[in-house]
Amino acid sequence: MPPQVLDFSDVVVRRNARNIVDHVDWTVHDDERWVVLGPNGAGKTTILQLADTLLHPTSGIVTIFGERLGRSDVFELRPRIGFASSAMARRVPPEETVVNVVMTAAYSVLGRWNEAYEDIDERRALRVLAEWRLDHLVDRTFGTLSEGEQKRVQIAR
């Protein structure tokens, strides 16, 4: 069986005396793709925030790439996690160029600040954009892209 990339074991997330996620067990293997569906307020976003290391469980164990959340450096895990959503698109600075959106993924940030990037970072981003046939958008700002283009840039990221 392919290796586990994500494992939830009896995971609970509690807010304001209410379980948002209630004793969830879930395993994702390397060769699997999942869709998370449910009504508003069911905990879908919370589950994805756990998987993206943006949130820790109240109880239970979340393991990502064999690393237990809470016992591992999330800043080392995050570059290995790909995540695309409308919520993430809203967090990308609209004035950020497409090449920067893709380039900053290697550092688990959404948008450039004052960090210095190396030539290899830009070459890698340009290569990925070309592979996804998005190289014509390199100098466009993220906020000027259509929703479909934004999603493709996030996936390339």
What is the role of each PLM region?
Residues S86-T144:
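ABC-family P-loop ATPase nucleotide-binding domains
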Residues L6, I20-H23, V138:
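Conserved structural motif at the start of ABC-family nucleotide-binding domains
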Residues S146-R152:
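ABC ATPase nucleotide-binding domain "signature motif"
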Residues L37-P39:
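The feature captures the beta-strand-to-loop junction immediately N-terminal to the Walker
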Residues G60-G70, L77:
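Conserved ABC transporter NBD signature motif
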Residues V28-D30:
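Conserved hydrophobic segment flanking the Walker A/P-loop of ABC-type ATPase nucleotide-binding domains
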Residues I155:
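Hydrophobic anchor residue at the start of the ABC signature
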Residues D52:
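Helix-to-loop junction immediately C-terminal to a conserved catalytic motif
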